[in-house]
């Protein structure tokens, strides 16, 4: 994908994170939905007064922001989505009154919608991002892991796709394997950037799921190492007999 889109995704995450730092939220916010057009920033925590989804592990918003006259977005995490975790799903439908302007900060800008959750300890883990939807412009998406356990943290980029469009779009990508996790947990975030080419509606579903595998215990690793040493020794002996 184009580098400027990666920078814009991360920049929007930073804005959402700074807003959360100065906005009151429930004691155990955990799951947070972030929405910005580059001018206005909305952060909706699970269980807050702005959350129109009453379920624990689900957050929702419906309203207007800038030229985006109707934005409907929902986000789910555990315990709604099935294990293993993290497993998050973000759904967005956004209607604009005009074409959006990339990089604009006066209310005409593209729409960035993201979902973040914290306190994950899954190890080992590989993260898959699956997206699909339709647009009259382009859509860019990415997901991140942050070992500082920060909401909207972008410490470790996992996957990025796009810009995709116009028309229908879909993609499936997977990250590298992670074999260690911080003791206090880590956060994950999935984000989507909508650029409308004209007035109209764009939509998308964005899923972040996790694949796990067993991590060998130290004793098992030692046995594996001894096995390799034995095989190497036998190979050298056989080679010596052939000479």
PLM regions and their residue ranges:
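Short linear functional motifs in flexible/disordered or boundary regions
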Residues: 127, 227, 235-237
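C-terminal membrane-anchoring or membrane-association module
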Residues: 232-243
